[in-house]
Amino acid sequence: MKNLTTRQAQILKAIINEYIAYPVPVGSKLLTKKYFKNLSGGTLRNEMAVLEKEGYLKKNHISSGRIPSQLGYQYYVKLLTKNDDKSNLKTRLRAIILQKHKTIDEIIELGVKFINEMVNLPVVLTHFSSDEVLKKIDLIMLDQSCALLLLVSASGNVFKKTISYANQRQFEDIMVCVRIFNDRIIDTRFCDIAQHLDVLKEIIRSKVHEYQYVIDEILFKLFNFEEFQQARKQVYGIHYLAQQPEFANQERLTRILNLLEDTSVWQQMAFMNQNNQTTNITFGDKLGLEGEEVSVASTLINTTNESKHQLAIVGPTRMDYQKVKALLLTLKEEIEEYDKQLHGGKTTSST
């Protein structure tokens, strides 16, 4: 991403702010009148042409004005937005959080509804629980170089893992590992299996042909614990989508609705963002929606009971990133602090 001059960055920011407020192409005449009284229309047009050439703006075919491109939004999110003055948000959210006799889940739900009202966009709230219990591991040979491991949980969920092997000795090692796992860790919570890995490694070391292969290809790949968390998803404010001009087309709206309903998308997003302590912005091309004017702002709230709560605001790429980032970050900070106080100052989980 190429760095812009100070003036180019200011022009890009003004165009995006204007387009966020009023979703119509922005021209040099408006910029001169509203934002840059000291610059001529010619200068602005030249700078806008440079921004368009570099891919930060694009031209609407029915207007001489420009609109932001996805690259422009990425630059805006990364370099041009700062945390809003959060004092007012903190005050209002704290009033929600300090309501007596409310559980953490209830407080998060109230916070989500507050965000709905503030941005007029839907919010996807996904709860991740670590209570899944392993009941059985099955092995299926697919061909001479690939096997499928099935991990079955007590709730009936089946997690599939494909394991590659180069020869019969490695396949025999896989069978040995499956027998050991079924003997040693059945009826163990997935989140507790890590505590048994050192013992398992010592048992496996004396039983297999290629110990390092087992470690690299089986243990590390098989027990990816984030994937075993139960996910419970709720969507709040879905009706707000119909208010966005970008989603007026029925086919486009249907694709966005399908995105909201796809739990795996939100699980994957949480897994990718698990070490991110702030707000993450994901654009449509990363969500399987190439060419769509959609983006997602998300954050993870960690609580001391090993649960996680992902909040994701879904909207057009022209959403007010400064506002949504401030809302999500403030809610995350306030709830994690409140949860820590409830549990005697224990640090919230960040895994």
Curated annotation (Swiss-Prot):
Keywords: Repressor, Stress response, Transcription, Transcription regulation
Keyword Transcription regulation: yes
Biological process annotations from GO: negative regulation of DNA-templated transcription
Pfam families: HrcA (PF01628)
InterPro entries: GAF-like_dom_sf, HrcA, HrcA_C, WH-like_DNA-bd_sf, WH_DNA-bd_sf
One Gene Ontology MF term: DNA binding
Family membership noted in the UniProt record: Belongs to the HrcA family.
Function of the molecule: Negative regulator of class I heat shock genes (grpE-dnaK-dnaJ and groELS operons). Prevents heat-shock induction of these operons.
NCBIfam families: hrcA (TIGR00331)
Designated name of the protein: Heat-inducible transcription repressor HrcA
Protein species of origin: Mycoplasma pneumoniae (strain ATCC 29342 / M129 / Subtype 1)
Gene: hrcA
